[in-house]
Amino acid sequence: MVGKRGLILITCQNSDCEYFLVEEGKNITKNGHNPAGNQQYLCHHCGRYFIETKNTPLYHSRLARSEVILIAKHSMEKTSIRGVSRVLDHHRDTISKYFHLIGQHAEMLNNHYIRDISAGNCEFDEIWSFIHKKNKNLLPDDPYEFGDCWTYTGFKRESGLMISFNAGKRVEKTCEIMLNYFFERMELPLPGNKISIFTDGNCQYSNTLQDLYCDSCMDYGQVIKSKEQNRLVRVIRERIFGNPEIKSISTSVVEGYNNKIRQRLSRFTRKTASYSKRMIGYVNSMNIFQFVHNFIDIKLDHQTPAMLERVTDHHWNWSEFLCHHIQL
C-alpha cells in the first residue's frame, strides 16, 4: 500500500519550468538518491529530475559539504584566500571558485529576504579600501576599478540590520546606487511614521535623499566632526530635513559596524597583503558578510538582526545558508 506523500519543502529548480521556484501549485516527488548521496526529486510539471543541491554552491561540488562550510567560515574570519588554501589544503583557485559561488548565493538571498523593512532610525557611512593598488601607485592605463574603493553602507540602528551597500569610487553615483537599494528594501514611510536618517557631513547623501523621500516623511540630520592633528576637537549636529531630535543625530552605530567589517574581512585592513585584486572578489566578500551579519551572527537576546526585524523566525546556520533555495 502506498503511503501518504510527505511534505516537500523544495520547489522546482529547473529554470525552464513554468513552476520554477514557485511554491503554490508545485507537484514534486522524491526520487531516490544520486551516486553522491544527494536527494533526487522529480517535477511532474516539466518531467525533469533535479537534486537538492541544484542552484546552490554545493551543486556538482567535488568537496564534501563540511569542507565548503569551512571555506565559507574562514572567509569571514580575517583569513585570506591563500590562508584558507593553506589551512584546508586545497588549491587557491578552488578556494576562489567556491568563494565566488558563495558570494553569488548570498547576494541572491539578500535580495530576496531583505524586503519591506519597517521605517525607523537608519545610519549611513562609508568605509575605505582599495582594489589591486592604492591611488598613489596608479598608472595612466590602469583599469578604472583599480585604486581607492569606497563602500557605502546603510544600517538600521535598533536592530543592527545591514540593509544595503554599494562599492565604487567616492562619487555621487556610488552613493545614489546604495540609496536606491536602500529605498527598494524599505517600507514607504508616512507623515505619521517617518523614517529618520543620519549621516556624516557628506553632501552626496542629501542630494539623493531629496529625490527619494518627501520632506514630510523624513527626518534627516548630519553629524559633522572636526579634527586637528588627527584628534577630535568638535562635533556639530545639524538638522537638514524635517525635525529630528538633536541628541539622536549620530553615526556611532554604523561606524561600529564598519569597524566590524574591518575586523572580520582581511581585505579591509589598512596595511595588508590580503587586499582585493578584483572588484568581483571585493563585492562577493561584502555579500557574504551582509548575509552572515544579518542571519547568522547573534546580536542580543539570542536573536540575529533579521530575527529582530522579523525577516526570519529562526537563527540560521551555515549549512542552511549554503543549501537554501528561495521560493516565490
At which residue positions do the language-model features occur?
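Residue-level recognition of single "structural anchor" positions
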Residues: 1-328
